[in-house]
């Protein structure tokens, strides 16, 4: 199956292809930002359902928390706006019977996202749990998964590796089974909470992401996190050196990058078939 925006594709053709091949389709929608966006959003919801989706992904912020927001007040205003938007679109989702999965996208901590979902208390809005993203917010992986599992509607399945860096650490996606996440255990937690979820493999072949958690600007939106999370995160990095060199793309030919990307994803599917049989 696939999780993707329609991007102008005929939704009925997508549905026919999925039904023919026996797969699945999950949508990917942009959130409306102002009231005048609601009509276009409802059209996208309707088309996503016509394509056969019962779940669609959204992200709340278009960037990483520690890069996009400079002050706590700025972040708080964004949080309130995001919660209000989800409240406003809930009747549209209910009308078309499409569930919306909000990804933990390096924007909200798992505590904040779980609190938002609890306040909404809607069967039509839940979480797309990305197994790796909250490492960028200094979280322990199992804690993240356990906190978000009650709301899970979809999954981005990743394995991750970490390396020390002068300003914090480097975070990389790595082929499933080669990183330090206990994926079988994390998946078991999620499936126990929602047996109907699908596991979407996400394996982007790119340069490591710098997590600048030794800088003051990183903590601008959650200053207390330096005291509560930093030491444990750095210990975790030191305790889990990469088992294999992480992917990188700088200075490499596009054709070689694409070949490695395909190989990494094929390896991921093979790992899933061998290790996640139900």
List where the protein language model places each region.
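Histidine-acidic metal/acid-base catalytic patches
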Residues: 110-124, 135-278
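The substrate-binding groove and active-site-proximal loops of carbohydrate-active enzymes
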Residues: 28-35, 72-76, 132-133, 173-178, ...
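N-terminal pre-domain/capping segments
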Residues: 1-55, 84-87, 122, 223-278
